[in-house]
């Protein structure tokens, strides 16, 4: 029968609490794993403990994205950086967040001044920005909180189906088929071949949207409307708390 194509994207909600931790709920943090890489979105107090409880590791984290700079979303960062350093991490770490990220990180690093790896800060200045990773991308989009705040969308694209008849017509040696199928070009004695020559139309991939601390916005509708998984806050879920939600921009 036909093979089934599966995109393995693991999502773990490490913390879902707001303002203060509870015995059963740490402060805000979400981790995603794909293709040997990990993304952390927010790093509230208790993130490391939750990671240990779930059996996840901070070692493969390539990027940490911050929605905004309230303490319950970022106060776990210094300890996380120190743990990475103690684990002898040497590869650079990318931090992504609203304007002012470098200043906030510098202040938090007063208690984590010496690290064996480089930290690169990417400050978001547009209403929408894309960060390209290895095999997937992160889309940041502005939302509406009482400080600059962004939602994030993790997108795993799926390339088109390999067209055997096209490959045969072009007389491409079969040993190169798997390379082209991965989306990589090849240079052979018969010439150069690109994936576009042998792949069909792109197929539906996977889209995960994470959004917290915001009023309802059109940007959320645009990015989450066709999401496979939409993770959203519910800080003031009860009807009697609607006025409080509007006041605090939740």
Question: Residue ranges of each PLM-predicted region?
Answer:
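Active-site metal-binding motif and surrounding structural segment of the metallo-beta-lactamase
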Residues: 45-96, 118-125
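Active-site neighborhood of phospho(di)ester-bond hydrolases with catalytic His/Asp-centered motifs
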Residues: 41-44, 61-69, 97-98, 208-214, ...
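A gly/proline- and charged-residue-enriched helix-loop-helix capping module
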Residues: 103-110, 121-126
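Conserved beta-strand hairpin/beta-sheet module of binuclear metal-dependent hydrolase folds
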Residues: 7-54, 92, 152-154, 200-211, ...
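Active-site-proximal loop/helix segment associated with metal-binding centers of metalloenzymes
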Residues: 22, 136-210, 214-223, 229-231
């Amino acid at each position: 029968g036909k093979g089934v194509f599966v995109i393995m994207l693991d999502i773990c909600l490490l913390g879902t609490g707001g303002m203060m931790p509870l015995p059963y709920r740490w402060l805000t943090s979400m981790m995603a794993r794909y293709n040997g890489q990990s993304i952390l979105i927010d790093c509230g107090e208790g993130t490391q403990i939750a990671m240990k409880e779930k059996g996840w590791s901070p070692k493969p984290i390539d990027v940490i994205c911050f929605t905004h700079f309230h303490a319950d979303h970022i106060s776990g960062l210094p300890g996380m950086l120190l743990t990475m350093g103690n684990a002898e991490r040497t590869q650079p770490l990318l931090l992504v967040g609203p304007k002012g990220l470098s200043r906030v990180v510098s202040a938090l690093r007063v208690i984590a001044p010496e690290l064996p790896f480089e930290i690169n800060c990417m400050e978001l200045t547009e209403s929408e920005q894309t960060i390209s990773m290895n095999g997937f991308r992160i889309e940041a989009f502005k939302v509406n909180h009482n400080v600059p705040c962004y939602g994030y969308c993790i997108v795993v694209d799926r390339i088109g189906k390999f067209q055997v008849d096209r490959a045969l017509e072009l007389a491409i040696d079969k040993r190169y088929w798997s390379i082209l199928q991965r989306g990589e070009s090849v240079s052979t004695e018969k010439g150069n071949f690109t994936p576009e020559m042998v792949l069909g139309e792109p197929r539906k991939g996977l889209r995960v949207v994470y959004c917290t601390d915001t009023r309802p916005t059109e940007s959320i509708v645009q990015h989450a409307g066709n999401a496979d998984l939409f993770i959203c806050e519910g800080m003031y879920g009860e009807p009697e708390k609607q006025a409080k939600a509007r006041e605090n921009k939740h």
